[in-house]
């Protein structure tokens, strides 16, 4: 598994990038906006929703959800304190920003109606553990919206790095769709 040291390195790396991340995250925006277009509130919803942005980074999409009606509680969880500090600066008030590991979420059972997770799960050592945690915190009938990268994504970049620096890995390995 990914060691705590590796997770700390990932969190620190994203923290360092937090100030410029939103300007450089075109793929994340494209994927997240595609997911948002599919997001619908149920007409029969009998209560306002509790929504979690898992792997929220600087809170770009968390802020978009803040503009929706019918959301009683909005939270963003990220491994990187630096990303969450940027999210707090970006506002608005009223969003709970939580430092947490997606494989061990610091949230109670059956406490969330909707989990939105955009291009985060590929950074996790055990995607199955993340999905089990999502199932644990989702209320019955809750919705999980996840986007990720699969094996074969970024193959051109991987090929270019292989030619430039043979024998060294510069592009993350991604799960196959069967593994998920």
Regions found by a protein language model. Name each.
Residues 113-126:
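A short SAM/SAH-binding and catalytic strip from SAM-dependent methyltransferases
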Residues 1-19:
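N-terminal, positively charged/glycine-rich alpha-helical extensions of SAM-dependent methyltransferases
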Residues 143-175:
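Conserved class I S-adenosyl-L-methionine
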Residues 50-105:
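Class I SAM-dependent methyltransferase SAM/SAH-binding core
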Residues 103-115:
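A short acidic, Gly/Pro-enriched loop at the edge of an enzyme's catalytic core
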Residues 26-47, 64:
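Conserved alpha-helix/loop element of class I SAM-dependent methyltransferases that forms part
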Residues 128-143:
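A short glycine-rich, Lys/Arg-flanked "PGG" loop and its adjoining helix->strand segment in the class I
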């Amino acid at each position: 598994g990914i060691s705590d040291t590796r997770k700390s390195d990932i969190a620190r790396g994203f923290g360092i990038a937090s100030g410029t991340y939103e300007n450089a995250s075109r793929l994340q925006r494209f994927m997240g906006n595609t997911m948002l277009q599919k997001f619908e509130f149920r007409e029969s919803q009998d209560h306002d929703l509790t929504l979690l942005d898992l792997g929220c980074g600087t809170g770009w999409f968390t802020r978009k959800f803040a503009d929706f009606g019918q959301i009683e509680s909005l939270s963003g969880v990220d491994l990187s304190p630096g990303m969450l500090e940027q999210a707090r600066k970006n506002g608005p008030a009223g969003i709970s920003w939580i430092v947490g590991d997606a494989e061990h979420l610091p949230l109670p059972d059956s406490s969330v109606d909707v989990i939105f997770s955009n291009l985060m799960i590929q950074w996790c050592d055990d995607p199955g553990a993340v999905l089990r945690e999502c199932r644990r915190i989702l209320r019955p009938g809750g919705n999980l919206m996840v986007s990720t990268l699969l094996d074969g994504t970024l193959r051109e970049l991987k090929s270019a790095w292989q030619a430039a620096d043979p024998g060294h890995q510069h592009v993350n390995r991604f799960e196959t769709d069967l593994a998920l």
